[in-house]
Amino acid sequence: MVIVNRNVDIQNSSTERSTINFANKIILAPMVRVGTLPTRLLALDYGADIVYTEELIDWKFLKSFRVVNDALHTIDYIDKTDGTVVFRTCEQEKKRVVVQLGTSDPKRALMVAKMIEKDVAAIDINMGCPKQFSLKGGMGAALLTQPEKAKSILSTLVQNIKVPITCKIRVFEDVEETVKLAKQLESTGISALGVHGRTIAERPQHPNRCETIKKVAEAVRIPVIANGGSREIENYKDILQFKAQCGASSVMIARAAQGNCSIFRQEGLLDLEEVIMNYLKYSIDYDNSPSNTKYCVQNMLKELQETPRGKKFLECQTLGQIWLVTFTFIKM
């Protein structure tokens, strides 16, 4: 049974928070379904400086209530309609976790930010997601073509929220148009700007536009966080090379971390078996949903899912089954 307390914060959480510095950082990027608590904690263990959540939609937060989970020592935001966890965090990541918010409205964004600001290090507005769900809702990359609305959302948060506000964008075909937008967003007072080096229409198989990111970094004074280089990133040295190529202050890693979170280790990658076991320990310790745990492990196993043992893993339905089958899988 999950024990919750709606009134008392763990470790006397205070509204006074230190400012997170986005300069010269290696960061876990926001990733749908992947950026849940176990992955974030694992990334921090392996050397990530900052970790982003997956994109969380404003109305999902507004349908939730905040509780202190005394059993897990976490802060949970629970959906009022079905009891599922919208967002779970803990003291270990408190000063380094950034919630990425999907929103198209300044008022809703502010309502959510007021709810969560004492539990997070910063709040990021997603202005780069190219998925139809986001575009149809006026969120994500839809905001790239509505700079006034984008600025309104950011300004509202910067002026009313105590933690730093950032945003993440995609580039345009035209470099100057990208630079112009970056300057407009910077003018709102945001603390950093994440830049994915592909357009809305481009996908991971397309080359990352590192030169465009470099032009943005040269044009603004705030830290620019380069993103989109995972195709060429196989180790920590590659991360630094990507950073230099983009001329960026910091780097944000997505797919390379999804496949093996130890990409953040300066000492080099760990065996996938060890990474999976460490991930599963966090999943069990923090009661991560079996479906999400299974999805994240599948992204690590990749083609190994097609082996007989991999197919057995796909049949798992509970955390206990996942642990048992995975433990057997990696020992054989």
Identify the residue ranges that each predicted region occupies:
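Glycine-rich tight-turn/loop motif centered on a GG-T
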Residues: 69-70, 74, 95, 132-150, ...
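Non-cysteine beta-strand/loop elements that form the S-adenosyl-L-methionine
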Residues: 53, 122-130, 187-198, 250-257
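Alpha/beta catalytic cores of nucleotide-metabolism and tRNA/nucleoside-modifying enzymes
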Residues: 1-27, 32, 37-38, 45, ...
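Short, small-residue-enriched loops and turns at beta-alpha junctions
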Residues: 59, 143, 172-175, 199-206, ...
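Active-site beta->alpha loop and helix N-cap motifs at the rims of alpha/beta catalytic domains
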Residues: 76-90, 94-165, 170-178, 183-186
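Glycine-rich, positively charged N-terminal anion/phosphate-binding segment
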Residues: 2-20, 31-115, 314
